[in-house]
Amino acid sequence: KSTLLHILGGVDRPTSGKVFVDGQDVYEQNEDELAVFRRRQVGLVYQFYNLIPVLTVEENITLPIRLDGRKINQERLKELLSTLKLVKRRKHLPSQLSGGQQQRVAIGRALINAPAIILADEPTGNLDTENTRDIMKLLRESNEVYRQTMILITHDREIAMQADRILEIQDGRL
């Protein structure tokens, strides 16, 4: 499942087959173009956060924008921090956060750009019931407002049932 997300998100190259986004084969791009594609078009939520330990919550969330040399939309950042319940933690480092808070930072980083594609590997796996509900609401709203394609991997049947389309992988087969 993680390999599938990495291939779809331009992180790992497939050994065979092609990945098309907006009619373009993603892997016909060189590494620099692929990096821009990932920063601008894909929001990745990893199962184990992948936060930069020396960056604050705010800096981790805005990393894709800063790597692109673009101006940060402070209203969007403020809105995300509020929704993610991280306003009071915005200057904290990942080591100063709980696992659930770190996951919310990772989700914020994936959503900050309003990318065309959101790829989420167990985005609510480390969250309590209330935060799970809030995150799923945020993902649904983002999907509707920005008309994003969202691929979410979960073992939680209740979360899966919220999807427009459900595909199951069993024993390595779709």
Can you say where each PLM-predicted feature lies in the sequence?
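ABC family nucleotide-binding domain
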Residues: 2-169
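Conserved switch/coupling elements of ABC/ABC-like ATPase nucleotide-binding domains
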Residues: 171-174
